[in-house]
Amino acid sequence: MISAAEQFRLISHGVADLLPEDEFKKKLEKAVATNTPLIVKLGLDPTAPDIHLGHTVVLRKLKLFQDFGHKVIILIGDFTARIGDPTGKSVTRPPLTEEQVITNAKTYQEQIFKVLDPEKTEVRFNSEWLSKLDFADVLKLASKYTVARMLERDDFHKRYTEGRPISIHEFMYPLMQGYDSIALKADVEFGGTDQTFNLLMGRHLQGEEGMPEQTIITMPILEGLDGVQKMSKSLGNYIGISEAPSEMYGKAMSIPDELMMRYFMLVTDMSIEEQEQLSKDLESGAAHPRDVKMKLAHTIVRLYHGEEAANFGQDEFVRVFQKHAMPTDIPEYKVAITEEPVFVPQLLSDAGLTASNGEARRSIKAGAFKIDGEKCNEEHIVLKDGMVLQVGKRKFIKIVSC
């Protein structure tokens, strides 16, 4: 293992909170002195299995722990997903079925290994121990915390003061997540800043059991492509880690300039020293923001698709956005071609170029719809084989007769 001081320097870079910091330093020092790896836990609730860059913020930090020789456990909350994490929710969430949980968990595992080393990752499911608790065990667990303390949590407090219902089983979620830390004997637990209450619950319950208490590391919430709200698939401001290289590159080029260095810090493998130098170059004018953003986009694509794909994504971006040419690889959309006009909003929606007919109409009205590179404001057109339809700057399909 490298020195505890160097591990701390690299691990603490870019984190939101490290609680308590002195304890974490001592854990690292002991791990190095005894050559005993720390047990580092990340719990995942498999309710939305498609991972985007926002999720990789914590995964990249976990990869650092793996590189230092520590033991990383990804805990799939298959049992707790049947309750649904109430964190940040204004209403009670419906539970998932067992089949949904299994399907989502499988997808999670496939995607997290795009960041983590599968040979150094232990995947566990909390049904291993939670399903074995009897009612007496549950009551004992419930006795470890008070309703008053539960209501200190922001989302519970807000719902309570507004008179909105909170189900008893929702109080059990943080307790069960905390119990996971007892079962795994976690030394460190990771999460987002919105999970601090639940993470501290694990520390509290470990102390109640007379165990060494875990330290907490929370990572910042990554802003999405709009630069304002957190990255979210539902908000459409995300970069999915399984997206095509050209799509991923194009999206990365839309990141606001002021967030470029934050993205380098949170979602890439660029060293701290390189980040500091690049930041200085931007401030001094030695580096142009466009070139830095292209470097960021190339780095992101390389991490998930490799160097060759990153080069392709960059070439496509230059071709389409700087030279205003058509992409070389346009997805085909098969449709029956007749002499009858088709309703364009429905076609665009069905083809996935827009999310709805309404969005399609707005795109047409705004001049964002093109046919073979030419703007079109018609809502009814006659299709032709090989015709290329475009919405916005990045969405294309080629019409193919079926």
Residues covered by each model-derived region:
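Positively charged, low-complexity intrinsically disordered leader regions
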Residues: 1-39
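Divalent-metal (Mg2+/Mn2+/Ca2+)-assisted nucleotide/phosphate chemistry catalytic cores
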Residues: 15, 95-218, 225
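N-terminal catalytic cores of NTP/NDP-binding nucleotidyl/phosphoryl-transfer enzymes
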Residues: 24-86, 190-196, 202
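Short, hydrophobic/aliphatic alpha-helical segments
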Residues: 35-44, 72, 173-183, 224, ...
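Buried hydrophobic packing segments
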Residues: 58-62, 175, 198-206, 300, ...
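Active-site rim/loop-helix segments in enzyme catalytic domains that contact anionic ligands
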Residues: 63, 73-112
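Short acidic, glycine/serine/threonine-rich loops at helix termini
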Residues: 84-88, 133-139, 227-231
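Conserved nucleotide- and phosphate/pyrophosphate-binding catalytic cores
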Residues: 205-402
